[in-house]
A protein has these predicted regions:
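Non-catalytic accessory/interaction domains
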Residues: 6-8, 13-19, 23, 27-30, ...
Length: 469
């Protein structure tokens, strides 16, 4: 039996557990756990046993909490409603919207959370005040902050106590354009990075503003995992969510800034490696000499291991700065499996119709391992080659039923997801996908689901591009 693991389950599970701690109170929660373990040592228990102890120590009835948090789907959106008088808050309401998925949900959950006010002091963005409160229903007043001076940043779910989509007001967005990297607390920064990414994906923040915020704070970020994720998000923002009329300018801005950061990164460190990867993903034609220089070993301290050499080589190949013969020369230095996989990706990324046809035929007709298939997919579908890839829209749809019917699930599902012409973000692609689904509504449910998810990615990108117009 095939199933898809829902990654959100892990994130939501951790956040909901944290919300339970906040809802009952940390000390009450710990006391309840002590009682629970003492009472039920060496016995089997149920959720009800734990809830009884939590209710006893906290004084809160938890059955309604369990019903809404553990037995309903979707995530609520929380946004501020603010009124200012004499430069002070006369009104701060938290507006809660039901989940957009499942469609038709009216679920409004109780949240125990904090709202924080942050001020610019010197070069830093510092928390002035953070008040906890119970949020319920469609609107909740934050009474504890009324009369406070206007802050530079107002953050709902300060300290990450609940599970919700959070929105920022315009003043807070403008503050982040210059000061997201000036927040010393790593948790607060991570929260804000997640919030602006979600706002971008939901077309509530333009790609132009998102990129400005990201570039202002990226160099100051101290968590290498966050930097890695931000690099991926920056590429997606430029290539998928930016309005086409803004894309080239934003790519130039991003790549120049990343190169500046790379020049300042500590030699031989993890951040230098990661900024090199980000630079290679965004490099413009004007910067190809700089990238070639890096490949030639002219960036102080950078370790050019096999992975890094191939990453840079393939970035140059993708942009027409290196040829197939250069790929062969690189492979001759190391014929390991990792090198062969990178070589296969490079061949598929050559910006010619002939190279794309060869890669497509390998994906469609040849029996190749999943590892090689993934690399060829990756090389074939390059956002820098949009015009070249237009020719493969119709063949994709023409081969859907045959690939699904004759290939293994692993191969057929990767074809549906990875060969979908995602570089062609347009209403025409959405319409073409909808038309295929309508005409083939008796096709396998798994195929239709995967295709619908791919289409929804384009719908999301179109909305983001419209926001960036």
């Amino acid at each position: 039996m095939l199933f898809r693991s829902d990654g959100i389950t892990y994130a939501k599970g951790a956040s909901v557990l944290q919300q339970l701690v906040a809802h009952t109170g940390r000390e009450n929660f710990i006391a309840a756990l002590r009682n629970y373990f003492a009472k039920h040592a060496f016995k089997n228990t149920t959720l009800e046993d734990l809830l009884k102890e939590l209710e006893a120590t906290s004084g809160r009835e938890l059955k309604p909490w369990v019903a809404t948090w553990l037995q309903t789907a979707g995530v609520n959106t929380l946004r501020p409603e603010i009124e200012i008088k004499d430069n002070k808050y006369s009104k701060i309401n938290i507006l809660q919207a039901p989940p957009s998925i499942p469609v038709g949900s009216k679920e409004l959950r109780p949240h125990r959370l904090a709202v924080g006010l942050y001020d610019i002091r010197g070069e830093k963005l510092i928390r002035r005040e953070s008040v906890e409160l119970d949020v319920s229903g469609a609107s909740t007043s934050v009474e504890g902050l009324l009369g406070e001076d206007l802050a530079d940043l107002l953050l709902i779910n300060d300290r990450d106590m609940s599970y919700a989509k959070v929105r920022l007001d315009d003043r807070s967005i403008n503050t982040l354009k210059t000061h997201i990297g000036k927040i010393e607390d790593e948790l607060t920064r991570s929260l804000l990075w997640a919030i602006i990414w979600d706002m971008l994906r939901d077309a509530e923040l333009s790609a132009t503003d998102f990129i400005e915020i990201l570039l202002s704070g990226l160099e100051s970020e101290t968590n290498i995992s966050v930097v890695t994720q931000l690099g991926v998000q920056l590429h997606t923002a430029v290539e998928s969510y930016a309005n086409p009329k803004n894309r080239d300018a934003l790519r130039n801005k991003a790549s120049k800034k990343i190169y500046e950061i790379l020049q300042r990164a500590r030699a031989g460190g993890d951040f230098q490696l990661q900024f090199t990867r980000i630079f290679a993903s965004l490099v413009t034609n004007e910067q190809l000499p700089e990238l070639r220089n890096i490949l030639n070993g002219n960036l102080n301290g950078l370790v050019l291991d096999l992975d890094m050499r191939w990453l840079i080589t393939n970035a140059l190949v993708e942009r027409g700065a290196l040829s197939e013969s250069d790929l062969e020369a690189e492979l001759s230095k190391d014929n390991s499996l990792a090198a062969q996989l990178a070589h296969a990706q490079g061949l598929a990324s050559i910006p010619t119709a002939d190279a794309k046809a060869k890669a497509w035929n390998r994906l469609i007709k040849e029996e190749i391992s999943s590892a090689f298939r993934e690399k060829i997919h990756l090389g074939f579908m390059r956002t820098t080659q949009r015009d070249l890839l237009k020719a493969w829209i119709d063949p994709y749809f023409e081969n859907l039923l045959e690939m699904w019917g004759k290939k293994s699930y692993d191969i057929s599902s990767s074809y549906v997801e990875l060969c979908y012409p995602i570089t062609q973000i347009s209403q025409e692609l959405v319409d073409k996908t909808n038309k295929w689904i309508m005409e083939n509504d008796k096709a396998a449910a798994g195929l239709l689901r995967l295709l619908g998810e791919a289409r929804d990615t384009v719908v999301r990108a179109l909305a983001a591009q419209a926001k960036d117009a």
